[in-house]
Amino acid sequence: AGEHSVTTLGINYYNAEDKQQGELEYLKWLLTEVQPSGLFSYVADSYDYWGFLEHILPTLKDIIMSRDGKYVVRPDSGNVIDVICGKEFIDYSEEPTLHSAALRFAYDYETQENNFEGVILYQKQYYKISISVTRNKLGLIDNYIVNRIDEYDLTIEDKGTVEWLYDIFGGTKTEQGYKLLDSHICMIYGDGITYERAEQIFNRLHEKGFASTNVVFGIGSWTMNQVSRDSLGIAVKATNAIVNDKQIPIYKQPKTDSTKNSAKGLLKVIKNEDGSYTTLNNVTVEEEQQGELVSVFKDGKLLREQTFEEIRNLIWK
């Protein structure tokens, strides 16, 4: 299994300018040289998760299908239910006409905007609906106007990971008739999984005709007692590496959740007059040495020895 610091290091080592090409080359190396067989999990949301699924996985399909083992796709950000199962669209097939289905969608849509659009399902076909609202002098809705109705093809984000993987790699059906991904591929999700979310995911997969065994959950502290490293705001992260004398920034910047952006490259920590600290990202080697950070370990050697008592005293200052 891989995690973000090692993964982003590999991506930027192969191609720091073109992240998609760098990730393609890095993953190909992992699949063919490092882990040519067996169970292999890869975190795929470091930069562009949906771009990874849409462009990189199809390119590596033959390699994945020829491996003696299972390749596991791992997203780690975004709306967990939508990432796994895709978006949920309301079926208005009970309406007598497509136009009345569009109006029903407008009535159900909760918004203060005068123009909005959305996607509905009608008679096994998806449609994109564009609506305008007319209002009276009091600002209350007077009427809905259907501007456009166009046939709509679901995007990769609309379908979600499981359906998209099935489209690419195919699969079989269980004895109960549910779709099961090919044995060479599956997915895992372990970020913020609760019992309630797990149940919602299984229900959505059931509605779409997919077996629950297409996804594995990583269940840890959040599910058990909702205490994690984030409870104290503490984590240890790699932000920079030197490979063949080359400085390589290590950072993630997932499109699926900008709040998970990490620190990048060499860091300079500045102590302000009020005692607070400011961190500067991706600085030069010279700038990094001017900050408050002090080397503790280097090349396997302990450079600064402190007792726990000294560390506790520093924390409480």
Map each language-model feature to its residues:
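Short beta-strand/loop segments at the ligand-binding rim of alpha/beta enzyme cores
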Residues: 171, 180-187, 214
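Extended hydrophobic packing segments that form well-structured cores
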Residues: 264-317
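Glycine-rich phosphate-binding active-site loops on the catalytic face of alpha/beta enzymes
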Residues: 208-235
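Acidic, Ser/Thr-rich peripheral helices and adjacent loops at domain boundaries
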Residues: 90-110, 232-254
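Buried, small/hydrophobic-residue-enriched core segments of structured protein domains
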Residues: 1-175, 195-197
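An anionic, glycine-rich sequence signature occurring as long contiguous blocks
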Residues: 239-282
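Glycine-rich beta-to-alpha transition loops that act as phosphate-gripper elements at the mouths
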Residues: 187-195, 219-223
